[in-house]
Swiss-Prot record:
E.C. no: 2.7.7.6
CDD domains found in the cross-reference section: RNA_pol_B_RPB2
Protein known as: DNA-directed RNA polymerase subunit beta
Main location: plastid
Subcellular location: Plastid, Chloroplast
Species whose genome carries this gene: Oryza sativa subsp. indica
Assigned protein family: Belongs to the RNA polymerase beta chain family.
Pfam families per UniProt: RNA_pol_Rpb2_2, RNA_pol_Rpb2_3, RNA_pol_Rpb2_6, RNA_pol_Rpb2_7
Recorded catalytic activity of this chain's protein: RNA(n) + a ribonucleoside 5'-triphosphate = RNA(n+1) + diphosphate
HAMAP family named in the record: RNApol_bact_RpoB (MF_01321)
Quaternary assembly: In plastids the minimal PEP RNA polymerase catalytic core is composed of four subunits: alpha, beta, beta', and beta''. When a (nuclear-encoded) sigma factor is associated with the core the holoenzyme is formed, which can initiate transcription.
NCBIfam families documented for this protein: PRK00405.1
GO MF annotation, one: ribonucleoside binding
Keyword list, A-Z: Chloroplast, DNA-directed RNA polymerase, Nucleotidyltransferase, Plastid, Transcription, Transferase
Length: 1075
């Protein structure tokens, strides 16, 4: 945050800054911290020791470019060199050695792992330390407990039982006396009694037998080990027993870490040094003292709020990468120890590099990181749907993951908004569904203190000194500091007009919201958007929307597809430029100079006598199959300055975010076609490519070696295939660039060798060879065919050849998709809908100047959803369109005066009506509404209709990827019923509820057909197709369908035999005919 010369002016921090700061901390501090922990590896038998030094480590530049890493499915990484020393007898060798590769963060704040962009999101966890709580049991008696949480997430509890004895519960089952625990940690009874405030309570409960157990540390350790490990009998104290207890309990559950030590000192008023990161007897005694005070002293009821951000910490990318580096060094230690043993067996002289060079050792580092990025829940595939998603993804915070909560067990309180989130975590932006409230997004001004893991928010300090100097100092407050300040909300900006000392303002103090005098205020928020994330800050008039709809809007903006011709919004909030800039989809000039030439692939810039080539992204596929493309925006010969936009990316216009289109909308019902959130659109949106988007799909095939040792072959010479299917292949058997391909066409021809079957040696095969000259094929055709819905233009073909037999071919196909019935569209206020009908433009309702409307929304979608912001936006958008203006409006403008939003909209509509001389734009009887006409009849509608220009997005949920049909296809081998899912070419299934619905109508014959003949009766389903086509009667089969046979087999597996008997109609005698 930078304070400018202008009073009260500040710049918004970079939105991707959090990821970059985290990675820089890992490189500068995390690597050194873990290398310092690396132990000296000694082999006393051979007088050898190996050591790594933390100082002077180096990272080389990556050997490949980002683009090559993506295309060739490689990891974008850098080689790490460390100083090492090897002492062998009297010989001392020092060498800088390579210990492996570390993935490097790119300019987007992401990593490229095996060719895929991945990002590590921040995890929010309970801080290590101690937490107290009191709760009532079933008898109404208060139970007091203290929970000690270690740095690794292990928990130990201190509790006082009904007999007023103090116990430490070290796991769910075992509990031990607090005196035994303290003695096992090294304190004797005298030291315990000297260091506590309630010695009489400590002395009241141990009997003579318990006092014997704590006479010495050894006896206490034996007692602790017996209860902790549930071991009976007489144990003898030994060093191995002590080491096992140290490893299983003290190292796992007693390591507080740097943050835990600070929290423990602060909570219990201790002064233990920060470098003592393990639990000490003094900590346990102080914690027990406090627990006794809560139980026996009246008035001490200080339960800890576990959901307060002061009791949480952020595990950023720095912490997670550092943990993995420590894990890799641990594996490296074991590998070096094994290598030392092998060296002496072979009797060769080692060097530091030869101890680390063996293949398995040198790839330990990169394999550890690749496993982490591939399997860790907080490592996600980078969302590249549009520039907004690229900016927002790295700012997510999640309570899920190892050591955190789970979607199924998290309580309502842990999901709820907490007052400490104010200005730190957005109260709106969270996922919908089972993880609601567990994943959030950082507010735009929030920053992470990477040392302590707290989230800080900036405020203006309003002190006497600052008032005299007439300047405002920005202070960053962590969650545990802002409890001591009176914080005024952002709407106190209106106080600049009047006498501030005489006014009262809403403020926050200790999680309560109050109204107090201005002179009592300590700090105030700096920006109206301070409480919201980027997604929430892009919603105009957000203060007029219900929070649930704002949540949907911030999520749906991330699903917007970049359109072929982007258009920036008429009504915005002002953050569009910063969001587009920080997404790095545009090309920004890094230095000033003059443009020499531009084309679709690169821009040549002359600067300080040097010619710089700036490559552009052209039709690159994103992780979500959208098209990433940069278009040059500077003409040849133009002089440019540093920071100027040279080329614009997808979904940006003029350096601003442009996710949708400004279209003319009307809020009215139309023949039921916009019932229940359906949307009626004009064919103009199709024919003029208003909502046309490009999508790129990737198809790949790999050659392999068969079990017989024969290699698969990519070729055009594929026997027994129609020439039509092979028409697009070149002489190598790969589809040509620029070809138009349809469903079923072959993209890459491939033959898999097979052992010749016996049929190739029988007489008929010899006859075929003699007469027709045909050779019996010994290869199986396994070509890459274009699946259903994949039609398009081939724009790129990549050959990746690791060795002569291992070849991978990737084909990229570009699809142009116009908007069609079934596509999903949405506004920026949670108003979403599916296209139900595309009307000819002459049939659409039209305005008084003859302009046909582009979209018709249902007006009933507004009052019940309470997202009135869309009405303000559409009316102001209409005025802006007529006046050729763009508006950037900050939220909560009612802080200046009442009804400020409505006054602004009406005044702009009135101005537009005056300038265009169209009185229908603003009619005082029904402002914002107008009489419009039915395009089919030319008659005016009965009621005036609200019309406006709204910014509508096309979402990635498109009908082309969802629509599916099947006549026949694959069946499940066991049940012989159609398989499930579009990807498997599956079919529909009459489930339980559908059967109930049919039973309700009593349609027995239809039910019988659906559940037997048409479904899983092998013979009948073939015959029923023929009978239906020719209009014959459906044949009746007596044998059971396949699913019934499965039931019989399952009963047999339970030793139950199922038989059936035929009963004669004449005399009802039973004939036992076993099937």
């Amino acid at each position: 945050m930078l304070r400018n010369g202008n009073e009260g002016m500040s710049t918004i921090p970079g939105f991707s800054q959090i990821q970059f700061e985290g990675f820089c901390r890992f490189i500068n501090q995390g690597l050194a911290e873990e290398l310092e922990k690396f132990p000296t590896i000694k082999d006393p038998d051979h007088e050898i020791s190996f050591q790594l030094f933390a100082k002077g480590y180096q990272l080389l530049e990556p050997s490949i470019k980002e683009r090559d890493a993506v295309y060739e499915s490689l990891t974008y990484s850098s080689e790490l060199y460390v100083s090492a020393r090897l002492i062998f007898g009297f010989d001392v060798q020092k060498q800088t050695i390579s210990i492996g590769n570390i993935p490097i963060m790119n300019s987007l704040g992401t990593f490229i792992i095996n060719g895929i962009y991945r990002i590590v999101i921040n995890q929010i966890l309970l801080s290590p330390g101690i937490y107290y709580r009191s709760e009532l049991d079933h008898k109404g008696i208060s139970i007091y407990t203290g929970t000690i949480i270690s740095d690794w997430g292990g928990r130990s509890e201190l509790a006082i039982d009904k007999k007023e004895r103090i116990w430490a519960r070290v796991s769910r089952k075992q509990k031990i006396s607090i005196l035994v625990l303290s003695s096992a940690m090294g304190s004797n009874l005298k030291e315990i009694l000297d260091n506590v405030s309630y010695p009489e309570i400590f002395l009241s409960f141990p009997n003579a037998k318990e006092k014997k157990r704590i006479e010495s540390k050894e006896k206490a350790i034996l007692e602790f080990y017996q209860q902790f490990a549930c071991v009976g009998g007489d144990l003898v104290f030994s060093e191995s027993l002590c080491e096992e207890l140290q490893k299983k309990f003290f190292q796992q559950k007693c390591e507080l870490g740097r943050i835990g030590r600070r929290n423990m000192n602060r909570r219990l008023n201790l002064d233990i040094p920060q470098n003592s990161t393990f639990l000490l007897p003094r900590d346990v005694l102080a914690a027990t003292d406090h627990l006794i005070g809560m139980k026996f002293e009246t008035g001490i009821l200080d339960d800890d709020d576990m959901n307060h951000l002061k009791n949480k910490r952020i595990r950023s990318v720095a912490d997670l990468l550092q943990d993995q580096f420590g894990l890799a060094l641990g594996r490296l230690q074991h590998a070096v120890q094994k290598t030392i043993r092998r060296v002496f067996i072979r009797q060769s002289k080692p060097t530091p590099q030869t101890l680390v060079t063996p293949t398995s050792t040198s790839i330990l580092l990169i394999t550890t990181y690749e496993t982490f990025f591939g399997t860790y829940p907080l490592s996600q595939v980078f969302d590249q749907t549009n520039p907004l998603t690229q900016t927002v993804h790295g700012r997510k915070v999640s309570c899920l993951g190892p050591g955190g909560l789970t979607g199924r067990t998290a309580s309502f309180r842990s999901r709820d908004i907490h007052p400490s989130h104010y200005g730190r975590i957005c109260p709106i932006d969270t996922s919908e569904g089972i993880n609601v409230g567990l994943t959030g997004s950082l507010a735009i001004h929030a920053r992470i203190d990477h040392w302590w893991g707290s989230v800080e928010s900036p405020f203006y300090e309003i002190s006497e000194k600052a008032k005299k100097k007439k300047e405002r100092q920005v202070v960053y407050l962590s969650p545990n500091r802002d409890e001591y300040y009176m914080i005024a909300a952002g709407n106190s900006l209106s106080l600049n007009r009047g006498i501030q000392e005489e006014q009262v303002v809403p403020a926050r103090y200790r999680q309560e919201f109050l109204t107090i005098a201005w002179e009592q205020i300590h700090v105030r928020s700096i920006f109206p958007f301070q409480y919201f994330s980027i997604g929430g800050s892009l919603i105009p008039f957000i203060e007029h929307n219900d929070a649930n709809r704002a949540l949907m809007s911030s999520n749906m903006q991330r699903q917007a597809v970049p359109l072929s011709r982007s258009e920036k919004c008429i009504v915005g909030t002002g953050l569009e430029r910063q969001t587009a800039l920080d997404s790095r989809v545009s090309v920004i000039a890094e230095r000033e100079g003059k443009i020499i030439s531009t084309n679709s692939h690169k821009i040549l810039l002359s600067s300080s006598g040097k010619t710089i080539s700036i490559p552009l992204v052209t039709h690159r596929r994103s992780n979500k199959n959208t098209c990433m493309h940069q278009k040059p925006r500077v003409p040849r010969g133009k002089s440019i300055k540093k920071g100027q936009i040279l080329a614009e990316g997808a979904a940006t216009v003029g350096g601003e975010l442009a996710l949708g289109k400004n279209v003319l909308v009307a809020y009215m019902p139309w023949e039921g076609y916009n019932f229940e959130d359906a949307v009626l659109i004009s064919e103009r949106l199709v024919y003029e490519d208003i909502y046309t988007s490009f999508h790129i799909r990737k198809y790949e095939i790999q050659t392999d070696t068969t079990s017989q040792g024969s290699a698969e072959k990519i070729t055009k010479e594929i026997p027994h295939l129609e020439e039509h299917l092979l028409r697009n292949l070149d002489r190598n058997g790969v589809v040509k660039l620029g070809s138009w391909v349809e469903t079923g066409d072959i993209l890459v021809g491939k033959l898999t060798p097979q052992i010749a079957s016996e049929s190739s040696y029988i007489a008929e095969a010899g006859l075929l060879r003699a007469i027709f000259g045909l050779e019996v094929s010994t290869s199986k055709e396994t070509s890459l065919k274009l699946p259903i819905g994949g039609r398009g233009r081939v724009i790129d073909v990549k050959w990746i050849q690791r060795d002569p037999l291992d070849i991978m071919v990737r084909v990229y196909i570009l699809q142009k998709r116009e908007i069609k019935v079934g596509d999903k569209v949405a506004g920026r206020h949670g108003n979403k809908g599916i296209i139900s009908k595309i009307l000819p433009r002459q049939d659409m309702p039209y305005l008084q100047d003859g302009t046909p409307v582009d979209m018709v929304f249902n007006p009933l979608g507004v009052p019940s959803r309470m997202n009135v912001g869309q009405i303000f936006e559409s009316s102001l958008g209409l005025a802006g369109d007529l006046l050729k203006k763009h508006y950037r409006i900050a939220p909560f403008d009612e802080r200046y005066e009442q009804e400020a939003s409505r006054k602004l909209v009406f005044s702009e509509l009135y101005e537009a009506s005056k300038q265009t001389k169209n009185p229908w734009v603003f009619e005082p009887e029904y402002p914002g509404k107008s009489r419009i006409f039915d395009g089919r009849t030319g008659d005016p509608f009965e009621q005036p209709v609200l019309i406006g220009k709204s910014y509508i997005l096309k979402l990635i949920h498109q009908v082309d990827e969802k629509i599916h049909g099947r006549s026949t296809g694959p069946y499940s081998l066991v049940t012989q019923q159609p398989v499930r899912g579009r990807a498997k070419q599956g079919g529909q299934r009459i489930g339980e509820m559908e059967v109930w619905a049919l039973e309700g109508f009593g349609v027995a014959h239809i039910l019988q057909e659906i559940l037997t003949y048409k479904s899983d009766h092998l013979i009948a389903r073939q015959e029923i197709l023929n009978a239906t086509i020719w209009g014959k009667r459906v044949p009746n089969h007596e044998d059971p369908p396949e699913s019934f046979r499965v039931l019989v087999r399952e009963l047999r597996s339970l030793a139950l035999e199922l038989n059936h008997f035929l009963v004669s109609q004449k005399n009802f005698q039973v004939n036992r005919e076993e099937v």
